[in-house]
C-alpha cells in the first residue's frame, strides 16, 4: 500500500496562502513560511481596522459638521444639543453629507436649531 502524505491537500493550502500573499514584498509573496506569517498579520490588521474605520468616520463627520456650523456662529456641541431639543433626528453621517454637498439644506437645519438655543 502506498504512503499517504496529503500532497494535494498541502499543495492546495500553500496555494491558498500564496494567493493571499500576492503583491507582498520580498520573500513574503513566494516563500510559504514567510507568507503565512505575513498573511496572518494582514488578517489581524484587517480585523482591527474594520472596527477602527467606524471610529475614524465618526470623527470625520464631526469635524465636517463642526466646520460647517462654525461658519454660522455656532459650535458643534451647541448645534447637536439644539438639534435634540428641536427633535430633528438626522444622524452625523447625513448631516456631514448635507454640510458638504447641500449647503442650502444644511443652512435651513442650522436656522431651525438656532431658534431653540
From Swiss-Prot:
The entry's keywords: Ribonucleoprotein, Ribosomal protein, RNA-binding, rRNA-binding
Signal sequence residues: none
HAMAP family named among the record's database cross-references: Ribosomal_bL20 (MF_00382)
Molecular function GO terms recorded: rRNA binding; structural constituent of ribosome
Matching PANTHER family: 39S RIBOSOMAL PROTEIN L20
Family stated for the protein in its record: Belongs to the bacterial ribosomal protein bL20 family.
InterPro entries from the UniProt entry: Ribosomal_bL20, RIBOSOMAL_L20_CS, Ribosomal_protein_bL20_C
UniProt-listed PROSITE patterns: RIBOSOMAL_L20 (PS00937)
Entries under Pfam families matching the protein: Ribosomal_L20
Protein source organism: Rickettsia rickettsii (strain Sheila Smith)
Protein name (database record): Large ribosomal subunit protein bL20
Disulfide bonds: none
Gene designation: rplT
Highest taxon listed in the record's lineage: Bacteria
GO BP, one annotated term: ribosomal large subunit assembly
GO CC, alphabetical: ribonucleoprotein complex; ribosome
Lineage: Bacteria, Pseudomonadati, Pseudomonadota, Alphaproteobacteria, Rickettsiales
General function of this protein: Binds directly to 23S ribosomal RNA and is necessary for the in vitro assembly process of the 50S ribosomal subunit. It is not involved in the protein synthesizing functions of that subunit.
